[in-house]
Structure formats: C-alpha cells, structure tokens
Design a protein with these regions (language model features):
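Noncatalytic modules at the cell exterior or secretory-pathway interfaces
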Residues: 31-35, 81-103
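Solvent-exposed serine/threonine-rich low-complexity stretches and specific carbohydrate-binding patches
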Residues: 7-13, 62-73
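C-terminal interaction-tip segments
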Residues: 1-19, 24-26, 40-42, 93-113
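Exposed aromatic-hydrophobic patches
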Residues: 21-25, 74-82
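Tryptophan-centered short beta-strand motifs
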Residues: 3, 16-23, 53-67
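Short, surface-exposed beta-strand/strand-loop-strand elements in extracellular ectodomains
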Residues: 43-59, 105
C-alpha cells in the first residue's frame, strides 16, 4: 500500500525444507525500513535470515541478519534497517522442525529531498 511518505505491506506463506526468498524489499528511494517476521505456526519453528545486496542485479551479498529461529506460537522478530546504501534485501525462510506458516509485515519511509 502506498503511504504519503512511504509504503507498507504484508506477505504470508509456508516454509519449506530449503531456503526460499519470502520477500524482496528494494531500498531506493527509501531510507528506513521496519520488518516484523512472525511464526504463525502452533507446532513448528521457523528459521529466517535477511540477505543484503549492494546492487540490484548484484551477486555479492552479506547476511544483514544471520540465521535466527522463531519458536512456534506467534514468536515475532523486529528488524530495523536505517540509512543504508543497500539496493535491496531478501527475507529468506526455511523450516525449523517442520513446515511453518509465517507472516511478514513491513513499512518503508521515503527519503526527504
């Protein structure tokens, strides 16, 4: 959804046995991003990481957030990325101890010119 000074959105899905990109967020023209990742599953844990790219079509990456685990039962993590030169970030998810349903919510604030 487009906001006056930025955007917001949500994405949900189910993890698998291999890492998949659940959501890609582009940073131009945004300066600040808040991401909530929630494990919406009552029986399985969820693992995630946030991978940053310097270039939109780049192949070199760095783990902005190394692999973390969210316990079953609506465990939620908050990630704040501010004033970064990243082109984009991928939020990647994988099974913890079984397929887990997840929800990702985010907001991005525009650069003020």
């Amino acid at each position: 959804m487009e906001l006056r000074d930025g955007i917001e959105g949500t994405k949900s899905g189910t993890s698998t046995a291999g890492y998949v990109t659940a959501l890609t967020l582009e940073f131009s023209p945004y300066k600040a991003t808040t991401i909530f990742i929630s494990n919406a599953d009552d029986t399985s844990s969820l693992k995630y990481k946030v991978v940053a790219y310097a270039l939109m079509a780049g192949t070199l990456t760095t783990d902005y957030v190394a692999e973390q685990t969210l316990a079953q039962g609506a465990d939620t993590a908050e990630i704040n990325i501010t004033e970064t030169p990243y082109a984009k970030v991928d939020i990647q998810v994988i099974d913890g101890d079984g397929n887990a349903d997840y929800v990702i919510e985010y907001t991005q604030e525009r650069l003020q010119r």
